[in-house]
Amino acid sequence: MRSAAYALSLLAAVAVLTFGRPALASHYAVADVPRLITPADAEKLKKAGVATTEDLLTKAAKTKDRKALAKSSGIGAGTLLDLARRCDLLRIKGIGSEMVLLLEAAGVKSVAELAKKDVAGLSPAVTRANQTKKITEKPPADEQIHFWIEEAKKLPVVLETK
């Protein structure tokens, strides 16, 4: 008899296949995610040499680098931290801009925070957040949330939040 963890992993894999190609931060130009980065901020970032969400995460991961980017872009360091947190979540396979907003609304702001969650606690929070904010037509199933949590546990912490 196979374990429950194996069954959940298998269901998560099926869910990923169902939801299509995984979304990764390197796949987005800053101008292509207007729900995450305003067009005005995207323009400022491009002028400061930040072309992709991956670039943004790299250049805003450390506090000192965020301060430098704030100076060169004209975007506040606090806003850059918020944007970097969003880009951090984009590193998880299957998470795109809509799911970043849903996770944020459920109280998850980074990969490190997601890695500490469990499905039993996060799934109801995601459901409540979506009922309140109406972010997506198709909220993630428990299997998808489990997959994201497991993926988050595998990724290194890159975002300095202090």
How would you describe each model-predicted region?
Residues 1:
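Conserved binding/catalytic microenvironments
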